[in-house]
Amino acid sequence: HWIIQGMLSLTDIRRIIQSGKPIVWTMHDMWPFTGICHYAGDCDKYATQCHNCPQLYKGSRKDIAYRTFQKKKKLFEGAQITFVACSRWLESLAKKSDLIKGQTITNIPNAINTNLFKPRDKKQAREKCHLPQDKKLLLFGSVKITDKRKGIDYLVSACKQIASSYPDFSKELGVVVFGNQAEQYASLFPFPIYPMNYVSNEKELVDIYNAVDLYVTPSLQDNLPNTIVEAMACGIPCIGFNVGGIPQMIDHLHNGYVAEYQSSKDLANGIHWALTEGEYESLSEEACRKAVSSYSESTIAKKYVEIYNKITGNHA
């Protein structure tokens, strides 16, 4: 995942390539096929040659993005690498990059433990999490709440629109937020907010998912968010923007709602629809079914075994 930051350098990767063995590289973001960035945003220079990087304070024609792109390109020449993206969206971006042209590029989603992440009693979950029993609860989570890419501002705006358009319905709502700096947004929501701060214990996370009614992820650019799969596995319908790998995970009006990109209004529509017009029990059952059938550890393991057998010539 994060192969740099003192874990694996380009020199280390070179040594692995020089072993002559076939390599399977799982991509969790765009770094393997860009100069230096993990998410390129609106920039598409990685398709041909990174330079004048918009993420650098002073990008230039031969900045560090340019130089690293060149190093990677030389590194990958002649290598036998199968790049596995975690979403069809990331796979499509990777195939545009000149950096890994000629390499095998495919996609396999992340796996989750569906024996742990599964539906549990909502009343008991709320008691454990000290959450009210009489509210319809929305959940938003991120390691860093203030990361603009995660889109919490759109959720705040959507909640304000709900409060304005559906005043009676809005009285039933509350927002559960997990992640660092959650308290900073408490005063911005028109509904009660219940900060959970940073959650590192998976069992506690399972309780939080089971305690809520909807998981809302207004992310502006994301690969295949584990939080969506985890919530779905617990039978929680999800709402998210039509971006990245999100529409691959959420089947619109079937197990959740895929909102128009960067539209707080449609995000609000999705929240209201799921909790008032949609058949909630059916949404919940389909969310759980999708998670188990598509993202269980056994399902994903079989897909990787197929790749390993193919690149090693073992077709048994």
Each language-model region and where it sits:
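Aromatic "clamp/platform" in nucleotide-sugar-dependent glycosyltransferases that forms part
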Residues: 220
